[in-house]
Amino acid sequence: MDYLEGLNDKQREAVTYGEGPLLILAGAGSGKTRVLTHRIAYLIEERGVLPYNILAITFTNKAANEMKERVGNLLGNKIDDLWIGTFHSTCVRILRRNIDKLGYSSNFVIYDSYDQKSVVKECIKELNLDKETYKERSILSTISSLKNTMVTPDEYINENYGNFYNRNVGELYALYEKKLKNNNGLDFDDLLLKT
């Protein structure tokens, strides 16, 4: 199969590009996914790259499924070992193989927003904090921000020791993390952070 058929000059150039990083800037509907899928097929068929050495990450499940389908149309059954998915699904795949190194088992549970709110509600009750002052949504937003900036509960508590409210938020964060760990659970931020 000719993996360059139907591509314009710039697309062909991207598909056959040598080694190293390549940044493609193009607007919606310009053929970026087409270039990526043809590049994957080209690397496997023409350059001998093993499928499990290719990682293609998208933002949405829809885009990931579309990419898998397109690569499948080009390569047939050679896509089983390809890593095509969203950031989170790729992280789950990596963690299922390696999370034991972090003290979790591979059958960890992923907490959705409802589960997270339930855990925070338990934490607020356990720490005897006022549920009107410490709202689940606000606490979860803070925990998410802290995780995304790689601030641990202890660091946050130490940084905010003189601030009663923030110190309590830090205590909530610490208890939240403990409860997730005790239940072999991860939230969506953990999927990225722990990978």
Task: Please name every model-derived segment.
Residues 19-38:
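Walker A/P-loop
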Residues 5, 34, 57:
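Active-site alpha-helix of zinc metalloproteases
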Residues 5-16:
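Pre-Walker A adenine-sensing motif
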Residues 1, 19-22, 41-195:
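A basic/glycine-biased coupling hinge at the interface between accessory DNA-binding modules
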Residues 8, 37, 189:
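Glycine-rich phosphate-binding loop at the start of an alpha helix
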